[in-house]
Amino acid sequence: MKRLFILSVVLALMLGVAVAGEDEIKPESICPKTLMKDSCLTCHSYPTFILKEINPESRYEYPITNMRLVGDTAHYVLQTVRAGEVQDFFDYILWHPFVKKIVIEVHSPGGSLFDGYKIVGMMQHMMAQGYVIETRVYGFAASAGFLIAASGTKGHRFVSPTSESMWHELMSFTMFAIDTPSDSEEKARVLRHLQDTANEWLASVGNLTMSELNEKIRKREFWLNGREAVEFGFADGFLK
């Protein structure tokens, strides 16, 4: 029994030393916070799992899959309106000073208005830094997608003649809710405020006034083909 006890102690000490040794010779590529077990994307970039502390390698270590670099131009295909994804794209560009131009191809049914606002705000910031942002619509840009497509650099917003764009009144959804008259009035007030903000911005980048936009979307959707997008000032020319 005594020998068995001594043997158990020796084995425990040996195992302890082995574990400690593994920790000491742990490869530097393994995140010291997660050990690549849980939440590894907190410290590592996808899909290569290089530590985020390492600057992304030009031309292949992209933060998102729907972007690419061609010469001095960064291309991005916006299919879902996600501000975080666009921010990763812009942050990547700022790491690469040789990029002079940004092309955003919008092919999206829209999404969150607030994500759309943030994306437009980031676009304005990048343009203020000297970047030209060209927007392209080959197929479909609706709702917040339309807001983004119309917000590129003036003279650099292009559409296909067969493309379709759409703008509409804002909508809110509440399931299984019981509203009082004052609740409904407050919701209407907030929606009106948000609608006016969006329409005011579109009026500033297009040829329609706020009142004209309000009239065109009142209880219906405002659809524009490529020719109409250029005619109403939300695009500057046609893709060739």
Predicted regions and their residues:
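Sec-dependent signal peptide recognition
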Residues: 2-8, 140
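Generic extreme N-terminus detector
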Residues: 5, 18-19
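Bacterial N-terminal signal peptides
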Residues: 8-16
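Terminal-region recognition feature
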Residues: 20-240
